[in-house]
Amino acid sequence: MKDYEVVIGLEVHVELATKTKIFCGCSTEFGGAPNSHTCPVCTGMPGSLPVLNKKVVEYAAAVGLATNCTITQDCKFDRKNYFYADNPQNYQISQLYLPICRNGHVDVTLSDGTEKTIRIHEIHMEEDAGKLVHDEWEGVSYVDYNRSGVPLIEIVSEPDMRSAEEVIAYLTKLRTTIQYLGASDCKLQEGSMRADVNLSVRERGSSEFGTRTETKNLNSFAAIERAIKAETARQIDLIEAGEKVVQETRRWNDDKEYSYAMRSKEDAQDYRYFPDPDLVPIHISDEYLAELKAKQPEFKDEKKARYIEEFGLPEYDAEILTDSKKFTEIFEEATAICNQPKKVSNWIMGETMRLMKEESAKTGREFRAEELTFSPESLAKIITLVEKKEINNAAAKEIFEHVFAENVDVDSLGI
């Protein structure tokens, strides 16, 4: 068999953490009663006019700056025209011709220590569609427009990735960066971060691209990795058998670990984009851009280096802690109180992560650091009590289990 390599590009949709929708004042809160967060604008009623949410522009530009993009200081919105039941306007407001961010990149470190730069073609703003709910028993479908108009950014990479490992490293870097900005919680399971994988294979050493497919319905990093491996093998098998790879969109079934064709890209409709006549072009001034640059936080790589230098943490500890913005907040606040950085790190990486794994096993879903509710002050108090020999390690772990589960104050436990 010939030696093949895989060529991968990603389209990553990120739901922004604004309180209201992109073009109206309806709430973006997740989980409300169906159609309870709607108005004439986000349900496409005739005569309703959109008003741009400034926070969306701020978040989109901030993500662009954090990913080394050039910010388009004069950009605009376009209409993408298509008919579908979850799209009440019969068009989606997006950005085709002048996206807000272009020509960026992120640097990732792979497991063997090598570094790779993955280019970003563009980042654009757009609105989400509604959600269809199918009742197979009754034979009817319902539509919930609560999600219609929720603000998204789409981050489009260049086809620079050559393995599932590189894809996961890129997505992890994006997720961490966006979470540090506070622009999104990036929960794949809840759909606030979604990745579509564009993949083709070619003979190693070739400069020509093969026929690509797009794979959707990937709601975890593990599912993305499995889908990439399966699609790579499928395409190689077709080529080896002398058959043609069809350019198409495929849907991944993670339970059965296979994908099936949804629609052919060759038959894709013309969306007939044109500038949205109801929205004026956006001008981002030099002053506003400078303000956004000044507000950029300390990101993972810088924070990791500081933890090693300032607190004397091992590189492994610093890597684990800075993977989550929540971990860094707990670490820094608890350390400021008890002045025991290594012990705080040990408690986060030991007992905290152990209890998180137990919670994940109980619920059948990943328990994320962002869900932690206990106060750093409580952790600092436990560490101080052990240090003063007022309690032993076994008692400390028992107390921490109550703090973890119930967010109780250590003082209220009568120690």
What are these regions (language model features)?
Residues 243-415:
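Long, charged, helix-rich clamp/arm modules that form nucleic acid-engaging surfaces
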Residues 1-297, 315, 336-340:
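Basic, nucleic-acid-interacting segments
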